[in-house]
Amino acid sequence: MRWQCGTRFRGLRPVVAPWTALLALGLPGWVLAVSATAAAVVPEQHASTAGQHPLDWLLTDRGPFHRAQEYADFMERYRQGFTTRYRIYREFARWKVNNLALERKDFFSLPLPLAPESIRNIRLLGRRPNLQQVTENLIKKYGTHFLLSATLGGEESLTIFVDKRKLGRKTETTGGASIIGGSGNSTAVSLETLHQLAASYFIDRESTLRRLHHIQIATGAIKVTETRTGPLGCSNYDNLDSVSSVLVQSPENKVQLLGLQVLLPEYLRERFVAAALSYITCSSEGELVCKENDCWCKCSPTFPDCNCPDADIQAMEDSLLQIQDSWATHNRQFEESEEFQALLKRLPDDRFLNSTAISQFWAMDTSLQHRYQQLGAGLKVLFKKTHRIVRRLFNLCKRCHRQPRFRLPKERSLSYWWNRIQSLLYCGESTFPGTFLEQSHSCTCPYDQSSCQGPIPCALGEGPACAHCAPDNSTRCGSCNPGYVLAQGLCRPEVAESLENFLGLETDLQDLELKYLLQKQDSRIEVHSIFISNDMRLGSWFDPSWRKRMLLTLKSNKYKPGLVHVMLALSLQICLTKNSTLEPVMAIYVNPFGGSHSESWFMPVNEGSFPDWERTNVDAAAQCQNWTITLGNRWKTFFETVHVYLRSRIKSLDDSSNETIYYEPLEMTDPSKNLGYMKINTLQVFGYSLPFDPDAIRDLILQLDYPYTQGSQDSALLQLIELRDRVNQLSPPGKVRLDLFSCLLRHRLKLANNEVGRIQSSLRAFNSKLPNPVEYETGKLCS
């Protein structure tokens, strides 16, 4: 609703017309110069208001819209439940005030009606005054600008905030008076009622406001606000006589100024501008100099520090100190927040928490994450404000003799907060908690605190770390990980107990001693075994044209169940008839612990670094030789049965190359053309027997399924792993070790295949948990 009242303000022109004076607005450094006929002074409060920088709102966080009072009022009412706003207003007409003195000069070419004192001061300056003279005689007396024109006006409005949820409810009225033209004790207020009251506001203001306030008190459904802006009112002209009311600073008014140099003679204008700039910028303490896009004050001898505004610098340094305090307050409030304290209470105290463990609890707490984001947002605002002040501070200190003194705040990283939690947990036994050092598991206490360290639980982890802390004292280790044993409060690598009760694998024979005994074929290292062959007999001559099979077996399961046997050498005494051209060839197969012939491995004679047969003559007349292959400590191996396959080849001399060549003999159908006969006198195995207790090993295996304690199961697994590795070390040469341990379980302990597989799986799983586990691939030998 607009109501123009321009016709009622036609009397304004006569009031403004007498202002034929030289006016200057009272901004900082400016004064008001008028003639003696109409002198007035701008109040000080207006001068300070106008001194605000016009672009200061750009440095705020949200801009002018969010700073507007109307927006703030609306947001406040909206939070209170008022969701609808009705506003009725009228805008006063605009009046433009012009400087008539300047109009007379421009349009009528009349001289300016300057005060006699002003004219005298201009003449006293002469034609070449210095800047100090201009400042003292003109600027300090009359200012730097004067009023050219101004636009004045105002607005009056009524705003009603409405909560529609409460509006339709019936209200009890006291005294039987109705709210709007009715009678009765109960009345419902509608939007139509509010519309009627708002329409009558500019007709009968007092009565309308009284009724609206009654509705506001009775229902709580509305909120009434009056607003008046601008210096003028349609019903009041009294305040037009004061300059303060005309020049009031409000968003509805516009004031246009002009430099005072336009009123001066030509020869004074340039000096006046220079003096005005120096006066405003340098505060009369120096002369403004601009060069290469930079301006500064050339200080006078009286004011050597005119370029260094100490008050402004000190104010900015104080602002930085306040920001630093606010920064610390933000961090302290975060530490004291419910989310942070709730995390501290949820952390377990039965084990030590390193930074990684705390980070996992931190990451799972969504409420703490949200609170930490709020902290980051607040610190980000402070950080931007700090940088803005620092840039301005360095600009001010650019030509100062001292550097600015400040300290930039530093954002605390996540690792800091994780360490802070450790400090509160383990270093909080004093008034002020200390700082926890994770590497040394100790606390650094404040200088005035003798001790701040509390009990630090044991550290859990893999390898030598604890598996559990002691229930009665969390600072001590209660149990260890697999492969470690608790000793004097520390977890040390567990070593398997001696295997002598299960299998004696130690021997005192050194390499030189063993070689001497084998050369002598000492009976003390002979393993007595049973000779079996269907093709021949010991000490009898036979025709070697066909392959002969013979074996030496021990039948340990039947005769020697408490022993296993190790072979160090194999020796045969072979005799040939005189002038025989046959050469014996042996293929050796070794069965380690029994079973079928297919579970034997072939001995790679003279392959790689494996030894070859050694032949020594025994009886020249009978042409007998001892054929011996020595394994020694390097190639010794378990054996239960040795299979020897004997065949022959023909030895001949190549005349062309003077070399011995061999070829297979042809089948002789005529006995008269026989190439010779062969005889085996002895077949011996040299080695030693080891004590072996299959029942003890079975009991050890039973502990895998029925352990007395967890420690007994781990000890049994360690012993079985040690036994497996020691047995497999005697595997024959090859790219892959043969799994002799499975053969031992299968044939000497009579375990089923599935039992053997289960045991091997348990050993592999346990071995993978041990420190520095050694895994190796094995080849299958026994089915």
Swiss-Prot record:
| InterPro entries to which the protein is assigned, alphabetical | BRINP (IPR033237), MACPF (IPR020864)
Name of the protein? BMP/retinoic acid-inducible neural-specific protein 2
Briefly, what is this protein's role? Answer: Inhibits neuronal cell proliferation by negative regulation of the cell cycle transition.
What domain of life is recorded for the organism?
Eukaryota
Annotated organism of origin = Pongo abelii (Sumatran orangutan)
What keywords would UniProt list here?
Cell cycle, Glycoprotein, Growth arrest, Secreted, Signal
This protein's GO CC annotations: cytoplasm; dendrite; extracellular region; neuronal cell body
Sugar-modified residues? N185, N354, N473, N579, N626, N658
Glycoprotein in keyword set: yes
Q: Which compartments is it annotated to reside in?
A: Secreted
Q: Which gene encodes it?
A: BRINP2
Q: Where is the signal peptide?
A: 1-33
**Residue ranges of every copy of the MACPF domain listed in the record:** 85-281
Q: Which family does it belong to?
A: Belongs to the BRINP family.
Single GO biological process annotation from the record: cellular response to retinoic acid
